[in-house]
Amino acid sequence: ACSKVVAAGASYEKMRFSYQEYFERMTDRKSWGKPLSALLGALKMQVEFGLPSIGGKDSMSGTFENINVPPMLMAFGITTVDAGQVISPELKYEGNKLYLIKHTPLENHMPDVGQLKANWKYVHEQIQAENIVSGYALGFGGLAEAICKMSFGNGLDARITYDEKELFNYGYGSIL
C-alpha cells in the first residue's frame, strides 16, 4: 500500500491504512492462527512506519460448504496529495528513461524498513521536482509486469538491460 501511494506522487508519511480481511470460518487453532498472524504482521509494519490504521472490514465467514476462500489480508493506503503532484504509471513519451528504485528484503525475508523509508523519500522528492513523470509499484509480477503495464498505456515499447532470472521476482516495495 505504501509503495503504491508513493508511486502515485504522495508521501507515505501521512498515509493511513485500511484493511480488508478474507479468511475461512474459524473452527480450530490453525484457522484462528491465520488472521492472527496476518494482523500481527500488519501491526508490526504500522509500528515500524509509524502509521495508523483507520479501520477495515473483515470477511471471516469465507466458507461455503467445503470450499474456503484463500486467506488474505489486503492493505489500502489513504492520504491526501496536491493534485498537481499526482503521476500515473504509463510511459508518457518516447525516450523516457526507466530506473528501478529497488527494495532488498532482509535475510529473514522481512522488509528493510530503513531502506524503504529512504527509497520512498527519494522517489517522492524526485516526483515533486518533476524528474519522475511515471511510477509503478512492483508487485507479484515483478519488473516484467511493471514494464508491460507501463508501456501498454501509450503503446510505447521499452528496452531494458536486466538479469532475466530476476524479471519475475516479486519486488515488493520497489518502484519503477
Regions found by a protein language model. Give the residues of each.
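A glycine- and small/hydrophobic-rich beta-loop-beta segment
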Residues: K92, L100-H103, N108-G135
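Short loop/turn motifs at secondary-structure junctions
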Residues: S11-E13, E94, N131
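Glycine- and acidic
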Residues: F17-R29, N108, Q128-V133, G173
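A general structural motif
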Residues: F76-D82, V113-W120, R159-E164
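Glycine-rich anion-binding loops of enzyme active sites
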Residues: R16-H103
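Glycine-/charge-enriched secondary-structure boundary and capping motifs
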Residues: S31, P35-F49, I54, D58-P71, ...
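Small-aliphatic-rich amphipathic alpha-helix that forms the alpha element of a beta-alpha
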Residues: A1-F17, A38-E48, Y122-E125, A146
